[in-house]
Amino acid sequence: MDSSTITRKNILDDVTSLLTSFGFKTSNIYDRNCFDLLARKKDILIILKILVNIDSLTPTQAEELSKISGTFLASPIIIGYKSKHNYLEEDIVYERHEIPVISPQTLCNIIVNDIHPEIFAKRGGYYVKINGNLLKNLREKNNLSLKELADISHVSRETIYKYEKGNSQTYPETAMMLEQVLNSPITESINLLETNNTKTTTLDKKIQEPIELIKLGYDIKSSNKAPFDAISERQEETEEVRQLKEKLESKLDEIEKIRAEINKKTKHHNLLITNMERNRSDNTLNKIANCTEDISLITGHDALFVLEHKKDKEFIKKIPAIYTWELKNMDNMEELLKLIKERKEEANDS
């Protein structure tokens, strides 16, 4: 395709087609939001923003994208075609506002061929990350001292020492020279589909509505750049989470693995995609319901409407509607979750 004719819609259509062809469930497309598309395959959840020029991403969009991704335990990725100065190169990870950026072809290589990039771009050029433990093991296996390997590779002894201790960022040319000497790959790939490979935060703008959900123990965190009003996060720990935390304290060598499991269990059971009535018309509520049902399906989290005025309906489209007077009469979160489940079943049977 002629580069002058490439549009955001072209890229978005190609990305959606690619993901669905390889087993991902994809959401509707959400223009004018901090993300355009959600995609899930088994435990992988990615949130995508599509741009032709990656420098058009605003700090506000990036911050909101990062927070929503962190809240959903998803991986945020920006797919772009060029920057202000250059076209994006294949199999290189760029960055804008601390969110990874790749070209459509790089995404294709990841999804189709399971080839993850190793090179990332930063100020000063291109870099790779060396596996320090592997480097040390290979050096010792080849009976090389730090100085001997350094001399052969034309770097300092201190540089090799730093690589082995984990300060492993270096130029691709240096890594290639070490690999030639050791006759083995030593660089680490960047798996953008893993949430622990992206720096994210969670939604933190707490709001004080609906007060009835807050009294049941939920934190309500709003998003101004998403197709829903807020995420309601349950603060009460389940017994399963408490047991995992005990396990965490007793097995220090598995800290990261268990912490990730805690996060998964906590988030999976504790998030509600939340929409408020806010004097919206029935037509507007129906449009919001369509978006919310779609996002709920992809993320795997329940959704609800909190309504103040009696509308003689227990769901909007397929999304349970809970009234503020019902919330006031509840004693705990379990009652709410039970009612959501009942109304969800009624909606599906209707």
Swiss-Prot record:
Keywords: DNA-binding, Transcription, Transcription regulation. Residues 146-165 bind DNA. Residues 135-189 form the HTH cro/C1-type domain. InterPro entries: Arc_TR_HTH, Cro/C1-type_HTH, Lambda_DNA-bd_dom_sf. GO terms for molecular function: DNA binding; DNA-binding transcription factor activity. PROSITE patterns: HTH_CROC1 (PS50943). Pfam families: HTH_3. This is Putative HTH-type transcriptional regulatory protein Msp_1143. It comes from Methanosphaera stadtmanae (strain ATCC 43021 / DSM 3091 / JCM 11832 / MCB-3).
